[in-house]
Amino acid sequence: MKIYVDADACPVKDVIIFEATKAEIPVTLVTSFSHYSNAEQPKGVETIYVDSGADAADYRIMQLAQKEDLIVTQDYGLASLALAKGCIVLHHKGYKYTNENIDQLLQTRYLSAMVRKSGKRTKGPKPFTAEDKEKFRALFKSMIPL
């Protein structure tokens, strides 16, 4: 198993890195050049930089990921592609994407886009909380081999 993180706006990178390095599972953070950092990462953690174009990180993750790898993303499109490839896919708020819930998530995203396109406003996501982080930590730990 390898772990791939859609890292541009991921608020749980610290949790992923801590738990994965403890379990000696390699982590690849995929992020755009606009988030470039000189910060050193622990052994087993790699950062891949991609262009800032739309979906560049998603395409790179899909090139790298193999069946049964774990992917962390908030992007429903990437989650859908990764599920089709046989990957385990988690959202940073602590829920697992599944073949049973992805269609509804994609439909909701589409309907919200149509409402915005018509000039109306839609609610954004709720703020990320400490409770969300702990929910993610528990789910993440249950998904990785010890």
From Swiss-Prot:
Pfam families: DUF188. It comes from the Bacteria. Belongs to the UPF0178 family. This is UPF0178 protein BT9727_2823. It comes from Bacillus thuringiensis subsp. konkukian (strain 97-27).
